[in-house]
Amino acid sequence: MEQEKRVFSIDVAGRPLVIETGELAKQANGAALVRYGDTVVLSTATASREAKDVDFFPLTVNYEERLYAVGKIPGGFIKREGRPSEKAILASRLIDRPIRPLFAEGFRNEVQVVSMVMSVDQDCSPEVAALIGSSVALTISDIPFEGPIAGVIVGRIDGQFVINPTVEQMEKSDMHLIVAGTKDAINMVEAGADEVPEEVMLEAIMFGHEEVKRLIAFQEEIAAQVGKEKMEVVLYEPDPELEAEIRQLAEADIKKAVQVPEKLARDAAIEDVKAGVIAKYEAEEADEEKLKQVQEILHKLVKEEVRRLITVEKIRPDGRKVDEIRPLSSAVGILPRTHGSGLFTRGQTQVLSVCTLGALGDVQILDGLDLEESKRFMHHYNFPPFSVGETGPMRGPGRREIGHGALGERALEPVVPSEREFPYTIRLVSEVLESNGSTSQASICASTLAMMDAGVPIKAPVAGIAMGLVKNEDHYTILTDIQGIEDHLGDMDFKVAGTRKGVTALQMDIKIKGLTRDILEEALQQARKGRLEILDHMMQTLSEPRKELSKYAPKILIMHINPDKIREVIGPSGKQINKIIDETGVKIDIEQDGTIFISSVDEEANQKAKQIIEDIVREVEVGQVYLGKVKRIEKFGAFVELFNGKDGLVHISELAEERIGKVEDIVSIGDEILVKVTEIDKQGRVNLSRKAVLREQRGAGELPKETREKRGRRPERHRMKP
């Protein structure tokens, strides 16, 4: 049946949000063109007709940036978009997280959601448009999606919450909060904040959810008019008789295995139970399909037992109380040649973070859809396979590593000193050495210690903690400092980072359909208690940033020049500035206001470069005496270089007190002589006098400090006769 174009509109934060269906991408299961202000995003949803032979839900979410959306042509030889940018990867994760919980357990059809950003209005977030567009595409399609969902950005200006703030408003806001959810509950939170109290964050989340409800009602109206009938799918379920058989066979052993306190020993005990059961069925020559069901049933039994222990008996796999943090240890300065290092260990999770300081020219250059062009504070997170005792390929960072790195960066950025206070580029690298849950939060703690060890004057130390949730019907248990098995088998991973004063970052992922205000409030308060405990421990290791930088860190010298002189320092095609860099070995960064940052590990090199720049921008002053070098000789006088690039003429009559016949009788090229500036004419030409200096010094009883072979007349030169 031919689809007709339909247009739906609603006002969001004073700007029209328009949804168009039925015209573009009609072969997808569902498609929606979202116009928010001048931002345009095409979102599509497509699903396979048959279930895939996998033991998970194969959902893929892609957020595709197109540089034509902001009128740019990609750089490089190829001149087309390549791998996704870091921001595109984070946006893909942002859309994936609220959508994924809203598919039925056992649904194994492959689903792909693609959002293409086609036009960007910086005041209207393309990520929000893509999130809403993805929900609309799924909701109006025949894919069995249990939505819709919606999301908004919440800012706070002068104590007032603002929905989807503009770029100008965002600069004044002390938080950047993204809230997504269904009409009944919140199922995704992502935030960066400037030490905002927990109770304010909670109110902001609930404020955002009210707008989410309005947007969901809008989507329900669209679905009622253009939505397709949902396809019938067969949800995967293991054989009930086989499940009862395996439960009888393995349940008692699984109950013992999951309560082994140490991670590796517990994993081994669980695997031994599973291996024994699988061996029994292999001996009976069970087919591949049956063995696959055996694996899934065993996993289900482990999950049920862990959840039962936590919710009913209030017992965690490692024996801790629900609000108890694992044993902590930390150290700083363990890598002697780095600028700063911090090691943070929490139970069997261990992260080593290293801080490197660089010149302002070391900033990361961004080529994306945002107005931002560079980044001077970076946090990178690496997760090698040995951290979980496994082998594996050592590739570049994946979506998870990029997401965890960005979360740490967002948590630490509010306490990083400004460029004026600390004119360095700062790069943090967090190496996960052991993993048993909460590595992203351990990286925040280790990075705080590394910056303090490096002497970065942070405003306050930051710590992070991951909260968990296990919910059965109306009963729930919130867990502090979740470990791997609790994250894997629980319902929530709620990461909270901040200082003693307040929250700097939040990230909430859940596997159930949503959370209520009460659960969020309890989780935030329990997280604060844990965060303060971790901060107390960290302060015992290093209570404040070191007063001095590492001797291996670059030293930065700041000077100011007249902005009109910048072109003289740079020179044609950068010739002058490159010459200074080659001569001294320093790095030089120049700002438009005339501020110059000179950086080098060698302080003497900084001073040398500064002197050269001062000479370049120095102005010749009438009446001043200079020690200059003779550069050129003419019949009428000598041209003398006063300092770098500045010269003047000493007329023959001004070279000596007595009358002379030739310039060469007094000076030669390369001589250093004292001269006085007598005049700068209308054309900018500088007139000099050596005679005036001689008179002044003779009157004072001093000899001129000149580098010459003789003073006064030179002997006549002998020439060979022809």
From Swiss-Prot:
Chief location category: cytoplasm
Enzyme Commission number(s): 2.7.7.8
Keyword Magnesium (UniProt): yes
Protein known as: Polyribonucleotide nucleotidyltransferase
PANTHER family: POLYRIBONUCLEOTIDE NUCLEOTIDYLTRANSFERASE, POLYRIBONUCLEOTIDE NUCLEOTIDYLTRANSFERASE 1, MITOCHONDRIAL
Gene source species: Geobacillus thermodenitrificans (strain NG80-2)
Biased composition (Basic residues): 710-722
UniProt region (Disordered), positions on chain: 697-722
